[in-house]
Amino acid sequence: MSKKLSVQEIILTLQKFWSDQGCMLMQSYDTEKGAGTMSPYTFLRAIGPEPWNAAYVEPSRRPADGRYGENPNRLYQHHQFQVVMKPSPENVQDLYLQSLEKLGINPLEHDIRFVEDNWENPSMGCAGVGWEVWLDGMEISQFTYFQQVGGLEVDPVTSEITYGLERLSSYIQDVNSVFDLEWGDGVKYGDIFLEPEFENSKYAFEDSNEELLLMLFDEYEKEAKRQIKNGLVHPAYDYCLKCSHTFNLMDARGMVSVTERAGYLDRIRNMAKSIAKEFVAQREKRGFPLLKHAQEETK
């Protein structure tokens, strides 16, 4: 690779490629979450019969992975480039390899392997058949066919591609620490994210208010359930995401025992399942508008 793309250029290249494949370019969702899959642009849109093709960058917070900015590859917050396509194109794997070529990675010149790694997110009632994608010995992506989301069967088949932007960028720029990555215009990743990484790690492991976190989880759960009863799916889902992030903070703080952990995950899963069910019911009442739109376009 003659020119080393900045993180910014990698994002722009992926956006252009997937937009050309018919994906809408969405923006990052503004509630904390542990993975791009948890954005409503994937979680809610993967269920039901309506077609959906979208791509977006999603900052993902995992408090227990924080290392005060001292570890070159483990982060409190990392970034994913998320692609979700429903129904899944038959050539989606080839499209993924083409996207790597656009980044200057020729599959014929590199060792690219799809390593079986079936995926699940028990707290959100999600599961699928999947593969890790390894590039010359480094995992750079996760490739998944959803089977279940929010406890509901996924039909038609939905494919998800998640690029780990920090790992992919580290490979392309040939750096050993994410903090040495060029984000754009000569500005380093560490210039932007090192201080937040340290502060968020310190908060998660040392300074968070344990009583407050316990109270917040309970109150967020109550509000999610109340809005489900009100038929307000999206506010309910926001509070479900807040419960998930609050639980992750509690877990990082060492507040959750093994037996308590299962109970908290059950509570989050029950919220997610109720929200998914209500979302599909509401879309059905509206006649699945995006399905109608797709049918009209094919006439």
Swiss-Prot record:
Cellular compartments annotated: Cytoplasm
Family under the similarity heading: Belongs to the class-II aminoacyl-tRNA synthetase family.
Record's catalysed reaction(s): tRNA(Gly) + glycine + ATP = glycyl-tRNA(Gly) + AMP + diphosphate
One BP term from GO: glycyl-tRNA aminoacylation
E.C. number(s) listed in UniProt: 6.1.1.14
Enzyme class: ligase
CC annotations in GO: cytosol
Listed GO MF terms: ATP binding; catalytic activity, acting on a protein; glycine-tRNA ligase activity; transferase activity
Top-rank lineage group of the source organism: Bacteria
UniProt keyword terms in alphabetical order: Aminoacyl-tRNA synthetase, ATP-binding, Cytoplasm, Ligase, Nucleotide-binding, Protein biosynthesis
Assembly with partners or alone: Tetramer of two alpha and two beta subunits.
Protein name, entry field: Glycine--tRNA ligase alpha subunit
